[in-house]
Amino acid sequence: MTTVVGTAGNDTLSGTEEKDRIWGLAGADEIDAGGGDDLVDGGAGNDRLTSRSGYDRLDGGEGDDLISLIGTGGAVTGGAGVDTLVVDLSNVSSDVRFSGEHGHGIIGYNTANWEHIFFNRIERLVLTTGSGNDRIFGAATDDIISTGAGNDVVGPYGVDGDDGTSMLGDDAIDTGSGGDIINDTVGANRIFAGDHNDIIITTLSSAVIDGGNGWDKLSIFDEGRTDGVTIDFGQGFASTGTLISGIEVASVDLGGGSDTLIAGNLSSLTAHMGDGDNYVAGGSGRDYVASGSGDDALYGGAGDDILISAGGNDVLAGGDGNDEIYYGGTSFGDGETYIDGGAGDDLIQVVAPSGFIDGGGGSDTLRVVDPLPGTNFDASTGTLGTTLIFTNIERFELSGGSGNDSIRTLAGDDQLAGNDGNDRLDGGAGNDVLWGGAGDDVMTGGAGADTFLWSSDTFSFAGVDRITDFDADGGDLLRFTGYAPDTTRIDSFADLVAAATETEDGLYIAFNGSDTFGLLLDKVALADLSADDVVFV
C-alpha cells in the first residue's frame, strides 16, 4: 500500500496501480486515484478527485469539490460545501439503475459483474449512461442526466413526506437515442429526449422541452395552475417561457384559468381544460378536447375529433372529419352557444335542446339526451321547441317526455322513443328504430327497413301500440329485448302466431292474453309474417 500526502498548497497528486491512501490536505488539489481500491481525502479547499478503475472511497472534505467516477463504481462523500458528483458511464453497455434520492447506483444491473455506487452530501449530480436499458431517478439536487442508446426511463423517484413535492431540483435531462420515458413532474430546466420514439411527462416549469427526432409524446400536467396560460405548439412556446419543439403528440391537463391551446402541426392533441374561458384550436389529426363550464371556443380542425363542453356560452366547431361534439350544459345560457359539425359525418349530442346547431356537410346526427320540450316536433321546421334552431341535420336520436308527444323526422336513420303518454312517432325515410314506450302509441316507420322495438322498461302492462306501415317485404322488424318476452308472454314466433287475431283493421297481437295490452299491425295478415320478421334478444 502506498501513502501519498499533499501540502497546505494546491497539489497535483496521483495514485499507483496498487491500493493507495491519498490525503490532499489544504489547498485546491487535483487527485487521480489511479488503479486499485483506494482511499482518497481531498481535505480543505475546492478539490478535484477522479476515480477511473477499482472501487475507490472518495471524500471531498471542506470546500466546493468536483468528484468524478469514470466508468467505475465507488463510494463518495461530498463533505462540507457545494459539491458536484460526475458519474460518466458512457462506455458502459450494461443496464444501470440509479437513485439520486437514495444515493445509490448499480452498474451492470442483473449481471454477474455488477458494481455499486454510493454517495452522500452531494449538491449537484451529473450522470451519463451508456447503451443499456437504464432506470434513472433523480434527487433533490440540481441534476444533469444524459442517457445513451438504450430504452431508458428517467424521472423522480418519489415525494417527500410533507408537501408532496417530487424529489427533483432544477435539472437537465438528455436521454440520447433510445425509446425513452422521461417522467419529471416538477419540471427540469432542460429536457432533451434525443432520437427515437420518446415519452415526456412534465409541467410548464421546464424552460426547454425538446422531443428530438422520432415520434415523441409530451404530457403536461398543470392541473393546479389557475393563472391562465397560452401553449402554442405551432410556434413552439408557452407563455410561462417554456420552449417546446420536436413533439408529435401532446396531452395537456390545465387548471381553472382561462387558457389558450393551439395544436399547430401536432398529429394529435388531447386537452383537459378547466372551468375558465378557454380557447383550443386542434390540428390536422384526431384531437380530444374536454372543457369545463366557462365560455369556451373549441375548434377541432381536420381529423375525426371529439369536443366536450360541460356548459357555458360556447363555440364548438368540429371542422373537417367525422367529429363527435358533446355539450353537457342543461341549457345554452343566453342562447349564444353555437355548434358547427363542419364537413364529415358528425355526431352532435346536447343535454337540453336549446341554442343553434349546424351539422355542416355530410350525414350528421343530432342526439338530445333530455326529453323534448312540449309535445310536437317536426324536423322539417328546423326548430325544436322554442329554444333550439338546427340546420343540416340528417339523423335524429330523440325521446318524448311524459305527455302525448308527436315526433316526425325526415330521411335519416333515426332513433325515436315516445316514453310515457300516447305518442305518435314518424321516422320518415331511412332505416329507423322506433320505441313507443308506455301508452297507446302510433308508429310509422316510413320508407326503409325499420325496427319497432319493445323492451322491459317500456311497459306499463297497458296500452295498444299501432304500426301503420309494417312491411315485412321491405325489411321491417319487430324486436323484443330484455324482459319484454317475459312481460308479453311472447318469446318465440310460435307464441306470436298463437296470440295473433286477424281483424278488419289488421293483425292484432295480444300481449299476455290481453285486449288492452298488445300490438296492432295495420293492414297486415298473419300470412304476411314469418319467423324472420321477429327478433327476440
Which residue stretches match the model-derived regions?
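Beta-strand-rich, repetitive solenoid scaffolds
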Residues: 264, 469-470, 480, 509-511, ...
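Short strand-coil-strand connectors
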Residues: 110-113, 185, 240, 255, ...
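Extended, small-residue-rich solenoid/repeat segments and analogous flexible loops
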Residues: 1-16, 126-128, 251-253, 261-263, ...
